[in-house]
UniProtKB/Swiss-Prot annotation:
SUPFAM superfamilies: Nudix. One of its GO terms (molecular function) is ADP-ribose diphosphatase activity. PANTHER family: NUCLEOSIDE DIPHOSPHATE-LINKED MOIETY X MOTIF 6, NUDIX HYDROLASE RELATED. Pfam families: NUDIX, Nudix_hydro. This is Nucleoside diphosphate-linked moiety X motif 6. Detected in liver (at protein level). Residues 42-177 form the Nudix hydrolase domain. Its main location: cytoplasm.
Amino acid sequence: MQSRLISIAASEGFTFHHAERNESTLTLWLKDGPSKLPGYATHQVGVAGAVLDEDNGKVLVVQDRNKTVNAWKFPGGLSDQGEDIGATAVREVLEETGIHSEFKSLLSIRQQHNHPGAFGKSDLYIICRLKPLSYTINFCHQECLKCEWMDLQELAYCSNTTIITSRVAKLLLYGYNEGFHLVDLTMRTFPAVYSGLFYSLYHKELPETYEGSATLL
């Protein structure tokens, strides 16, 4: 919309719905009662990758340069529009650490409202399990202070980390010792009810006896 038209639309009762880059969308509910138009984005999505080397039990960790507390954490960042969760984890790990990896599963989801870094919106922070495809660290010094392969047991009970990192490290340790089928949410792609579109569904693996032809939902 041309900016000179905004004041005219506002005088007729239109209000801002959302703005993105060079475009603004204003709306006006014409029926009686309050507007039932759905709001715009309510969440931002951050994704981290827990890259575990199953041959030696070491996990890839970083310390962010711009944090007030230099705690060990999994490398990650914000998901781009239209980017799958696993793809975000793989991309962010490569950008921050130089390590190539492969998505294996989703481990956890944290929801936090009124997130300071999300312009007052809610934040979803998702941690994925990744398999390393390379091992030589070449980390980004602009984003990270440190980067190393740390023993998973050490990270799980380390005092110099966050609650969520420690808890997911323990979950990862449980899967490493007892079997990842106990902790993994795997991803499957299905056709959506909308023509030509597909969606990703994350869930625990189903036994073969329960598998059947998919019904569109």
